[in-house]
């Protein structure tokens, strides 16, 4: 796929650089656009998972998106019984293909770090 925006990037930027950049944009979008979203039920969780997936797939060069939200419901059942999405509740995998490079990036809560870590899971480059 031709990229009409490529001319705005430095000529030093490789396909690998752009694939990694685009993967970071996708994860940043998920974290900064959707954290704070109110959730009350498992149905809300499923709808939000699908919304995040569709939003990220709408961005350029996305091949695949997987979203899982970890949700613990409070047993009170009252009118104020809801929670809001946090980055640590998301398990997100995004696959981006730009030029000759494919990147799988992940956002996942790492208990050892007590942090929702965004990281590169895999990089593949096609040999020409």
Spans of model-derived segments:
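Short beta-strand/helix segments in adaptor/scaffold domains that form protein-protein interfaces
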Residues: 1-128
């Amino acid at each position: 796929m031709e990229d009409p925006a490529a001319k705005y990037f430095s000529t030093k930027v490789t396909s690998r650089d752009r694939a990694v950049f685009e993967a970071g944009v996708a994860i940043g979008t998920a974290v900064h656009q959707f954290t704070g979203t109110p959730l009350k039920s498992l149905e809300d969780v499923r709808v939000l998972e699908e919304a995040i997936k569709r939003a990220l797939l709408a961005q350029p060069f996305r091949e695949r998106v997987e979203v899982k939200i970890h949700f613990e419901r409070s047993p009170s059942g009252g009118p104020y019984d809801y929670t809001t999405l946090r980055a640590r509740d998301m398990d997100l995998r995004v696959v981006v293909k730009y030029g000759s490079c494919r990147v799988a990036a992940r956002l996942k809560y790492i208990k050892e770090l007590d942090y929702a870590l965004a990281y590169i899971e895999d990089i593949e480059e096609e040999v020409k």
